[in-house]
Amino acid sequence: MHQYHKLQVEAIYCGTVIDHIPAQVGIKLLSWFKLTATDERITIGLNLPSNKQGKKDLIKIENVLLTEEQANQLAIYAPYATVNRIANYNVVCKRTLTLPESIANVFICPNSNCVSRSEPVASGFIIKTRGKQIHLKCKYCEKVFERRAVESSNLK
């Protein structure tokens, strides 16, 4: 296995680095979790070489610090990602993610009859795991969906 010592994406002075995102998931995280809702510079590395994963994605957001809750929501799609807080070009806090119990205002319920699709209410799901599978239970219609079904209903 090759050791990669070259910096693939430019370092940032201050902000957040989301590392070890599964390849092909980085852009989805930017969209679903509204990580681009800032005027700060965002650097994205896609399909970067990784000793552990083979390939990975990477997101760097300057001058933006994610809360623990925001970071943990990413675990739904990037369970082994790390969220690093950067100050003066150094990692000052490295956080591994924990799957949250619930998630709100991120995804739309796939059930076309769900009240959350027709009424001005915030969407919300309770997160359940079955083995390694992640399922989301809508807090309104109480239907349980595989993660992929919720993902598909949110593609534009």
UniProtKB/Swiss-Prot annotation:
Encoding gene, per UniProt annotation: pyrI
GO cellular component terms attached to this protein's record: aspartate carbamoyltransferase complex
Function: Involved in allosteric regulation of aspartate carbamoyltransferase.
Biological process, per Gene Ontology: 'de novo' pyrimidine nucleobase biosynthetic process; pyrimidine nucleotide biosynthetic process
GO MF annotations in UniProt: metal ion binding
Keywords associated with the record: Metal-binding, Pyrimidine biosynthesis, Zinc
One Pfam family matching this protein: PyrI_C
Cofactor: Zn(2+)
UniProt-annotated binding residues for Zn(2+): C109, C114, C138, C141
Cofactor annotation comment: Binds 1 zinc ion per subunit.
HAMAP family according to UniProt: Asp_carb_tr_reg
Stated name of the protein: Aspartate carbamoyltransferase regulatory chain
